[in-house]
A protein has these predicted regions:
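Conserved donor-binding/catalytic core segment of Leloir-type glycosyltransferases
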Residues: 166-185, 191-195, 202
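A charged, aromatic-enriched C-terminal amphipathic alpha-helix characteristic of glycosyltransferases
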Residues: 20, 306-342
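Membrane-proximal helix-turn-helix segments that form the acceptor-binding/catalytic region
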Residues: 104-126
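Nucleotide-activated donor-binding/catalytic signature segment of Leloir-type glycosyltransferases, i.e.
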Residues: 214-235
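Short alpha-helical donor nucleotide-sugar binding micro-motif in glycosyltransferases
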Residues: 231-232, 239-244
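Conserved acidic donor-binding segment of nucleotide-sugar-dependent glycosyltransferases
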Residues: 286-294, 302-308
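Aromatic "clamp/platform" in nucleotide-sugar-dependent glycosyltransferases that forms part
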Residues: 252
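Short hydrophobic beta-strand element within catalytic cores of glycosyltransferases
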Residues: 260, 269-272
Length: 342
């Protein structure tokens, strides 16, 4: 089978190795290369012969999108694919307004959704992760549905870590891992729910700078049921997944919720935002919450800690549907279907 040559570009400045978009890019590279393809992650230092690529995937949205598109459209062979990140949490109508009118290419007023809208017809096709993203691209940008391919995102955990789970040994706490200071992760309401409903909460992840550190300690100091364990290595993270009875992701802004997928295959009950795309991945087997409602968050976590939930059915479902082998073959199939002759 002929190898496909692919370049993946992230169109924004990035300083976080563990950011969701860059993690997705590395997973795609690894998975597609295991199928025999050639994948380059583009940076500013390498030498790239653009006309040797079959595809250039623009992964995500950002301020560098226009620069890349204006430069790359001069190369004739590669097809350019958009794999956008649509985690918009307000109304569809406001998304349409924002994407069409909030920004100006002529005046160099760059806004990610406006820039994506401006470039919408420059892409050969789109790769989306959910029906939620598909609707925004099809209806918001007026893109033919035949040019939109929905591909599930795979979890990144190697199968060797996914031993059988002893649910009887699960510990009675709720776990959360994220960029804790990001407003979209809604950590403050999660903490307030733990304080009000007195359940054990373990927080992990990054906090940026002294201001965020002070903010976190103001919220949790003096509350012995809440613990911050810092940034975790992968092995440490997997250990907390395997021990926790519940994982909570009550985000206001969330694209897929990779950490919730990961936690589910370690046997956690999942508390999940009812906003946006993440709920599509769980087939009705997550406890959905209104992320603005502390009581809803707290009561659903307490219920899940009592053992009311969807495991082990959820674990089996995610292992079957979101493993790397299945998802990468789906992506490879789409690329081969649309491949042009050299």
């Amino acid at each position: 089978m002929e190898r496909i040559r692919i370049a993946i570009i992230v169109p924004f400045a990035n300083v976080f190795y563990s950011g969701g978009v860059t993690v997705q890019g590395r997973m795609w590279k690894e998975g597609l290369e295991e199928l025999g393809n050639i994948v380059d992650l583009v940076d500013n230092w390498g030498k790239f012969d653009w006309n040797t690529y079959d595809y250039i995937i623009i992964l995500g949205n950002g301020k560098l999108l226009l620069d890349y598109m204006f430069l790359l459209r001069g190369f004739k062979h590669p097809q350019i694919i958009s794999a956008p990140i649509i985690d918009y949490h307000k109304s569809f109508f406001s998304f349409v307004l924002r994407s069409r009118y909030f920004g100006s290419v002529r005046l160099k007023i760059n806004k990610p959704f406006h820039d994506l809208y401006y470039c919408r017809n420059m892409f050969d096709f789109y790769l989306v992760r959910s029906e939620y993203e598909s609707r925004f691209i099809e209806k918001g940008f007026h893109i033919d549905i035949k040019k939109i391919y929905k591909l599930p995102l795979n979890f990144r955990i190697p199968m060797r870590y996914l031993k059988n789970i002893d649910f009887e040994k699960k510990e009675n706490f709720c776990f959360h891992s994220s960029r804790l200071g990001s407003p979209g992760k809604n950590v403050e309401r999660l903490i307030k729910a733990a304080i009000k409903y007195d359940f054990n909460l373990v927080l992990a992840g990054s906090i940026k700078g002294h201001e965020q550190e002070s903010w976190l300690h103001r919220l949790i100091d003096g509350h012995h049921n809440i613990q911050y364990v810092g940034w975790l290595s992968d092995e440490e993270l997997y250990d907390y997944y395997s021990r926790a009875k519940v994982f909570a992701l009550p985000s206001i802004i969330e694209g897929v919720g990779m950490v919730a997928l990961e936690a589910s295959i370690f046997g956690c009950e999942i508390i999940l935002t009812n906003i946006g795309a993440p709920k599509e991945y769980f087939n009705g087997m997550a406890h959905l919450v209104n992320p603005y409602d502390i009581d809803d968050i707290g009561l659903k976590i307490k219920k899940a800690l009592l053992g009311v939930g969807y495991q082990p059915r959820l674990r089996k479902y995610i292992l079957n549907r979101n493993n790397s082998d299945y998802c990468m073959k789906e992506l490879d199939s789409v690329l081969r279907k649309n491949q042009k002759e050299r």
